[in-house]
Design a protein with these regions (language model features):
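ATP-dependent carboxylate activation and anion-phosphoryl transfer catalytic cores
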Residues: 2, 6, 12, 25, ...
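Glycine/threonine-rich flexible loop motifs
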Residues: 17-27, 93-97, 569-579
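Short, acidic/small-residue loops that bind anionic groups at enzyme active sites
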Residues: 33-39, 103-121, 589-591
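A conserved helix-loop-beta module that forms one wall/lid of the active-site cleft
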Residues: 54, 108-177, 611-614
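Periplasmic-binding protein-like
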Residues: 82-88
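Short Gly/Thr/Asp-enriched flexible loops that form oxyanion-binding sites at enzyme active sites
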Residues: 91-109
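Extended, domain-scale alpha-helical bundle/helix-rich regions
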Residues: 482-485, 491-498
Length: 624
């Protein structure tokens, strides 16, 4: 461990905003937990009163002040910390840390940056330095030029040739970014981008390529491995925060996956990152060509997703690594004993964003390289069909799955497919039902045929269910397969009985038939520790794809179930996660077994350490 680390300053992320939400409450809480375990005094700077990390007992001292250079310097002057953690408060903390470093404030007070150095952070944040650094090891980046004036920007765009991509340095959630087909569009976007950042990057457009992400961790002894691989359902051109994301990767073969994994470890080593980082690639499967789009040398939204997807506590381990521990040393502590081992998944997860665009009159529903989504969900299952259907129900906007959403209809399908909006996934369903081929849809959307083929399976099975007129006529094998493919009782009732109204009676008829045939979901564990003792874990999900329970229910013990609030949305955010966490903690203190049901990967409530059992699944009558 870093010598003489008696007091450490942790920079939080401040107010929630698009591109920076509850995931940093989760990562910051994990970092503070790691410090407490080491007996290190922690000082937190975060003005967000709705977070878990600012609650009593998490940090030793909390300053509800802005995360800015002026205020943080005053806190450093008063508290005299030995070290500072910058990677757990998102872009806000990273930018503040970079300013503290460049202004000499950290050196002035003898504060050591723990984990990844500020120099390495600057390599990833300054687009020009980033490209030059990766060129040293012959890693491909988009043809680009960093500029700081409109005159240079126009010259760069003309040299590269339209269409071009514009990105802002030190920006959050793709702010000020976009693809420009011509100079008129470019002038408008570049002017807007310079309002957010003094430097922008003009680069070749790779729109339509696959977007692949890796979460990688490295310690000071240079042990490095991939914790999770993730694939964006939507092609490049749509921000990863706006895209459906699936883990593990689905459409890559073993050779392609191995190549990108090896490039990831090569990249993190050359940049000198110590801790966790997220690497994003553009990938062309037709040519095996790639570009490194971005590296985040900090905990991110994708890090929280990877942690919940795999059960590997990335933020906790990253904090320990920042303190100087190696991954094998963390493993020997038994917290967790998986720190030295890459997680193995026998299931799929799917992240789906939630938008609240209808609350703002005149706002464009088109999605692209800048984030508009305000929340997200994560579904877990044994097939893509299952997780996409579960996930679309979890969003909480009245959808019943991929099919069966009678209130959604599109007049111009070609436009809806080629110019994506927040409803494009439902346009895919209508297109398939209207006879569009997978080849035609791929041409319009550039979504990989692997995903489209799985979605077509759902549409085809809807037609199979619609051939029955009575619930009691559905054979057991047909009903079971429908559940395996993620169909809810409501969907089955709609396709078989075609009723009007709220369908409560028909829904119960399907439920009764299913139970009569013994078609019930199994409770399965996620192996959070990748060890010889998976039966010890309490991270659970439900699926119809396999038989048998991995848990025994509490029989002679009192227990309390806490229902989480699901995806963040306007009017329901991290404050309800605070309520959920405090509820399970209070239940535990009173001697009850605490059970949490929630499906938001950004939250502290979906950390399996917070309760006796975590069910990462739907909040619905069918799951009750």
């Amino acid at each position: 461990m870093e010598k003489e680390m008696k007091k450490v300053l942790v920079l939080g992320s401040g107010a929630l905003k698009i591109g920076q939400a509850g995931e940093f409450d989760y990562s910051g809480s994990q970092a503070l937990k790691a410090l407490k375990e080491e007996g290190i005094n922690s000082v937190l700077v975060n003005p967000n009163i709705a977070t878990i990390q600012t609650s009593e007992g998490i940090a030793d001292k909390v300053y509800f002040l802005p995360v800015t250079t002026y205020f943080v310097e005053e806190i450093i002057k008063k508290e005299r910390p030995d070290g500072i953690l910058l990677a757990f408060g998102g872009q806000t903390a990273l930018n503040c840390g970079a300013e503290l470093y460049t202004q000499g404030i950290l050196d002035k007070y003898g504060v050591k940056v723990l984990g990844t150095s500020v120099e390495a952070i600057m390599y990833t944040e300054d687009r020009d330095l980033f490209v030059k650094k990766l060129n040293e090891i012959d890693m491909k980046t988009p043809v680009s030029q960093a500029v700081e004036s409109m005159e240079d920007a126009i010259a760069a765009a003309r040299r590269i040739g339209y269409p071009v991509m514009v990105r802002s340095a030190y920006a959050l959630g793709g702010l000020g970014s976009g693809i420009c087909a011509n100079e008129e569009e470019f002038l408008k976007l570049a002017e807007s981008s310079f309002a957010f950042s003094k430097q922008i990057l003009v680069e070749e457009s790779l729109k339509g390529w696959k977007e692949i992400e890796f979460e990688v961790i490295r310690d000071a002894n240079d042990h490095c491995f991939t914790v999770a691989s993730m694939e964006n359902f939507d092609p490049l051109g749509i921000h990863t925060g706006e895209s459906i994301v699936v883990a593990p990767t689905c459409s890559l073969d073993d050779k392609e996956l191995k190549m990108l994994q090896e490039l990831s470890t090569k990249c993190i080593r050359h940049l000198g990152i110590v801790g966790e980082c997220n690497i994003q690639y553009a990938f062309n499967s037709d040519t095996d060509d790639y570009r490194v789009i971005e590296v985040n040398a900090r905990l991110s939204r994708s890090s929280a997703l990877a942690s919940k997807a795999t059960g590997y506590p990335l933020a906790f381990v990253a904090a320990k690594v920042a303190l100087g521990y190696t991954l094998d040393q963390i493993g020997e502590m038994g917290t967790p004993n998986s720190a030295y081992v890459a997680p193995q998944l026998d299931y799929y997860i799917c992240k789906i964003p939630r938008w609240d665009l209808t609350k703002f009159a005149g706002v464009s529903r088109e999605i692209g390289s800048s984030m508009k989504s305000v929340g997200e969900i994560m579904s877990i299952g044994r097939s893509f069909e299952e997780i996409i259907q579960k996930g679309l129900r979890m969003i909480g906007q009245g959808m019943h799955g991929f099919v069966g959403n009678d209130d959604v209809h599109f007049e111009d399908l070609d436009k809806e497919l080629s110019h994506p909006t927040d409803l494009r996934v439902f346009a895919l369903a209508q297109a398939m039902e209207d006879g569009y081929t997978i080849e035609r849809i791929h041409e319009l959307t550039k979504i990989d045929p692997w995903f489209l083929g799985k979605l077509k399976n759902i549409v085809d099975y809807k037609a199979k269910l619609s051939a029955y007129d009575k619930v009691e006529d559905i054979p057991a094998d047909v009903l079971r397969e429908a559940k395996v493919l993620g169909f809810s009782d409501f969907q089955i009732a709609r396709f078989v009985l075609n009723p009007a109204g709220n369908m409560e009676k028909e829904n119960l008829m399907v439920r009764a038939r299913r139970k009569e045939l013994g078609i019930l979901p199994a409770v399965k564990r996620i192996n959070t520790i990748a060890s010889e003792h998976p039966e010890l874990t309490n991270y659970l999900y439900m699926t119809y794809a396999v038989q048998g329970y991995d848990v025994n229910y509490y029989k002679n013990e009192k227990s309390v179930v806490v229902l989480g609030s699901g995806a963040y949305r306007i009017g329901s955010s991290v404050e309800f996660d605070w309520c959920s966490v405090n509820a399970v903690q209070t239940a535990r203190k009173l001697g009850y077994k605490s059970i949490m049901i929630n499906y938001n990967p950004e939250t502290v409530s979906t950390d399996y350490d917070m309760c006796d059992r975590l069910y990462f699944d739907e909040l619905s009558f069918e799951r009750g």
